Regions:
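Active-site catalytic microenvironments in core metabolic enzymes, especially phosphate/sugar-handling
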Residues: 1-99
Length: 99
């Protein structure tokens, strides 16, 4: 049963020691180092979910934009880019004919 989830957008490796002594059941973040995450899990820390760095940060940008607009109204113009900067993009390719 998951009761409490901690989320850190971007690289959250630096919080593992703090989470080891918390009541968190699952930790969602990015860029976890292989050996560091393995050692953490060996000591019964929370379950780890390692998502793409870009995806972890991009999801909250519309929320930040809305807060800026709420605070500053028409004194500021905002726009959240839709340009994906994730270097880990995979696209299907057309099969090449055999020669």
């Amino acid at each position: 049963v998951v009761r409490r989830v901690a989320v850190c957008g971007g690289s959250g490796d630096f919080l593992l020691d703090e989470l080891a002594h918390s009541d968190v059941d699952v930790y969602v973040t990015s860029d976890l180092r292989h050996h560091r995450a393995g050692e953490f899990l060996e000591h019964d820390g929370p379950a780890l979910i390692d998502v793409a760095h870009w995806a972890a940060e991009w999801t909250w940008l519309p929320v930040v934009e809305a807060r800026i607009v709420d605070a500053l109204g028409d004194r500021v113009s905002t726009r959240v880019s839709t340009h994906c900067t994730d270097p880990w993009q995979f696209r299907p390719v057309e099969p090449q004919e055999s020669r």
